Swiss-Prot record:
The gene is lig. Coiled coil: none annotated. Optimum temperature is 60-80 degrees Celsius. Keywords: ATP-binding, Cell cycle, Cell division, DNA damage, DNA recombination, DNA repair, DNA replication, Ligase, Magnesium, Metal-binding, Nucleotide-binding. CDD domains: Adenylation_DNA_ligase_Arch_LigB, OBF_DNA_ligase_I. This is DNA ligase. GO terms for biological process: cell division; DNA biosynthetic process; DNA recombination; DNA repair; lagging strand elongation.
Length: 601
């Protein structure tokens, strides 16, 4: 399969803003792709060489390296490449222009012929894999040579998207949800197969793997798919409510209640003597927690399992729980074994999804928890999450306050009974979180995605000082603007922010972003931040839940303030528009005269 086919589709996709059109065009590309390498095609569409959970290196090519490779491939001096980059802001476009110029001025271009061999997807994939995996002395020069070699063989359009792929900025506006729908259309007979494909992806979060199974065995093979150790399951997510009475009513009057820990959610896999740890974002974080690997190996019985819990920093002296920030300090230390001594952790397990070749995601919570409790040996490091069973509001409140006093964030209220299955990848009422932040006027903090930036004034003149934030709408696979946040940042954070955002700025709005407000710069929807505010208000300036509460208006956060970055969350893990609406409906309402100026921006 020629790489040119993918490049041509990327060129079309880049110019489309309609999700329906994106999905249809992507389905067309998938249906025309070589079935033998369909997994590689899917990974390339995702902008990666392999799933994040494998823990393999990323391409790791900086701007200077790319400029050097483009210079070599197009026989252009580096200064000229840099100047063109300054004027376009897009190295992919630079490569396209220089390759076009090279073709038109060459003798073969003059004659209107070409002897160039076609660049294949296999060649691109294998060469870029070498680039990513090459390490050691001389690796820098080898990476540049390999990349320059690809660019030499590429035509202008191929060069454009090769460079963008290496940069990690394809800019074609495709999320995983769109790929899933396209796969259902291309291989499953239509949109009706989306649920089957999505269920499979929820159990095995590897789109390339799912695509390969479909083309080799058919859509029916996905219906009986089980979790596989080593491939993470998409985590089950909780709804949120602030009223204990309503929570108990939602779960049927009786529930299992766990502490909600202020740590890092972890999915732990074991197969024989190998143990893998995956983050909430399904990234392989095994190397960050060699102590947890040792604890699981020693204290959890079984040859093959997938379990879930929270890794929590604890005081080495008292054993009391520390805040989430302590884990972040640990991650920043270069010597992991020194970090283990300074920031020890405990693991609090709360679920089991797979055990000795049996899929437990379809079994009730009580069955899963009973088995989990039976396989954990008594020890000081790996424990079952603190929990009780409640059937009245008083016990729920009492346990909630206890969790807070012991350093937790609140509690997780979980439905029990035969229907209380593990809903992989879904947010539903089987789990409901009650956090201490609910005591404020705005019921909870929210996790929002950065989609734009605004320049400041005075000492922040010419630098980013506030951000346009958006919530995720899973129904449309888009990000809808919620607020403009300018407070809560330190000067150091703002300086760091400037650097981070300049690397992913865009000339035009991302096709997955829905915003009336025009920031000074548009940003790729990559970073997630935790935000708190005074209340959620109706706003004509924002698109979150547009026309749902009031015609021609959306919902916004009044007086928003930055709390922290949520590096453990992907953009699709951000607070959803439905959750924002739910929070708005639950908060106390005050009748205010219609203001001429909206304060929520």
């Amino acid at each position: 399969m020629e790489f040119k086919v993918i490049a041509e589709y990327f060129d079309k996709l880049e110019k489309i803003s309609s999700r329906l059109q994106l999905t249809a065009l992507l389905a067309d590309l998938l249906s025309k792709s070589d079935k033998a390498i369909i997994d590689k095609v899917v990974y390339i569409i995702q902008g990666k060489l392999w799933p994040d959970f494998l823990g393999y290196p990323e391409l790791g090519i900086g701007e200077k390296f790319l400029i050097k490779a483009i210079s070599i491939a197009t026989n252009t001096d580096e200064n000229s490449v840099e100047n063109l980059y300054k004027s376009t802001g897009d190295l992919g476009e630079v490569a396209r222009r220089l390759k076009s110029k090279q073709q038109s001025t060459g003798i073969l271009g003059f004659l209107g012929t070409s002897s160039k061999e076609s660049l294949t997807v296999d060649e691109v994939y294998s060469t870029l894999s070498k680039v990513a995996l090459t390490t050691g002395e001389g690796s820098r020069d080898l990476k540049i040579r390999l990349l320059a070699g690809l660019l030499k063989k590429a035509d202008p359009l191929e060069a454009k998207f090769l460079v963008r792929f290496v940069e990690g900025r394809l800019r074609v506006g495709i999320g995983d949800a769109t790929v899933l729908d396209a796969m259902a259309i291309a291989f499953g007979g239509g949109q009706s197969a989306s649920e089957i494909v999505e269920r499979a992806y929820n159990l095995r979060a590897d789109l390339g793997n799912i695509a390969k199974i479909i083309v080799e065995k058919g859509i029916e093979a996905l219906k009986t798919l089980k979790p596989e150790v080593g491939i993470p399951i998409r985590p089950m997510l909780a709804e949120r409510l602030s009223n204990p009475e309503e929570i108990l009513k939602k779960v049927g009057g009786s529930a299992l209640v766990d502490y909600k820990y202020d740590g890092e959610r972890a999915q732990i896999h074991k197969k024989s003597d190998k143990i893998f740890i995956f983050s909430r974002r399904l990234e392989n974080i095994t190397s960050q927690y060699p102590d947890v690997v040792e604890y699981i190996s020693k204290y959890v019985e079984g040859k093959e399992f997938i379990i879930e819990g929270e890794i929590v920093a604890v005081d080495p002296e008292s054993g009391e729980m520390r805040a989430f920030q302590e884990l972040m300090h640990r991650k920043r230390k270069s010597d992991i074994y020194e970090a283990i001594k300074e920031y020890p952790v405990n693991v609090f397990l709360f679920d089991l999804m797979y055990y000795e070749d049996v899929d437990y995601t379809t079994k009730p919570l009580e069955v899963r928890r009973k088995l989990l409790e039976s396989i954990v040996k008594p020890n000081d490091y790996v424990k079952i999450a603190h929990h009780i069973q409640v059937n009245n509001v008083e016990d729920l409140k009492s346990f909630f306050y206890r969790a807070i006093s012991e350093g937790g964030e609140g509690v997780m209220v979980k439905a029990i009974g035969k229907d209380a299955i593990y809903q992989a990848g879904a947010r539903g009422w089987l789990w409901i979180k009650l956090k201490r932040d609910y005591q404020s006027e705005m019921a909870d903090t929210v996790d929002l995605v950065v989609v734009g930036g605004f320049y400041g004034k005075g000492k922040r003149g010419g630098k980013i000082s506030s951000l346009l934030m958006a919530a995720y709408n899973p129904k449309t696979d888009t990000f809808e603007s919620v607020c403009k946040v300018a407070s809560g940042f330190s000067d150091e954070q703002l300086d760091e922010l400037q650097k981070k955002l300049m690397e992913i700025k865009r000339d035009i709005k991302h096709p997955r972003v829905n915003s009336k407000m025009e920031p000074d710069i548009w940003i790729e929807p990559v970073y997630v931040a935790e935000i708190i505010g005074a209340e959620i208000t109706i706003s004509p300036l924002h698109t979150c839940c547009q026309d749902v509460v009031e015609k021609d208006a959306g919902l916004s956060i009044r007086f928003p303030r930055f709390i922290r970055w949520r590096d453990d969350k992907s953009p699709e893990d951000a607070t959803t528009t439905d959750e924002i609406l739910e929070m708005y409906n639950k908060q106390p309402k005050k009748k205010i005269e219609s203001p001429l100026v909206d304060e929520s921006v």
